[in-house]
Amino acid sequence: LNIGATALFNLVIQFALYPYLNKTLGKEMYGTALFMLSLVAIASGSCGTAANYSRLVSEKTLRPSNGDYNLFLLVGGILCAAVGLFYLWWIKLLTPITAILFAALLIVTAFRYYSDVEFKLKTSFVRYFFFYLAISVGYLLGLLVYRKTNQWMTALLTGEIFGLVYAAFASRIYRH
């Protein structure tokens, strides 16, 4: 199930999300969007994955409790957002709406990368599958939000939020 979960997630990204963004944004803006998404993957992905792996390896020796990584993820996400906003300013794309959406995407994605750790710890492959299903469905619904708002980051933000909401209800990872 865990292979199917990530396969579904990647299929939605590669065959629905990215092609739709490519078609609607145009070559230049799509290239900029991919670079911005690379920043999200590198910065927020590293932050969230570091917390995820740290929790996995420290589980037996340090006995961390749920919520222990919340502050780290928030601070890490804010630092990622600061770097991302500097980049937007540098390439002269910083507007109030892009600042809000990109900062939110960077912060939420850091948390999302961490969110599946409890499913791994408890070997709950069904919940792990539904976590990635929630993100995938969120990305697809996010394309509708993008069509209405004309803000491409809303497509991704919707998917990330769907994943976080599922993790918040299906696990205790963010609760003390």
Give the residues covered by each predicted segment.
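Hydrophobic alpha-helical transmembrane segments
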Residues: 100-103, 129-175
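Membrane-interface helix-capping segments at transmembrane helix termini in multi-pass transporters
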Residues: 25-34, 60-71, 80-104, 148-154
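Alpha-helical transmembrane segments of multi-pass membrane proteins
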Residues: 39-46, 77-82, 86, 92-115, ...
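Signature of the first transmembrane helix
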Residues: 1-49
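Transmembrane-helix boundary and interhelical linker motifs in polytopic inner-membrane proteins
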Residues: 25-29, 40-73, 120-123
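Structural signal for membrane-spanning alpha-helices in multi-pass inner-membrane proteins
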Residues: 18, 45, 84-88, 139-143, ...
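Alpha-helical transmembrane segments of multi-pass membrane transporters/permeases
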Residues: 1-11, 63, 67-70, 103-106, ...
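Transmembrane alpha-helix boundary and packing residues in multipass membrane permease domains
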Residues: 19-23, 37, 53, 57, ...
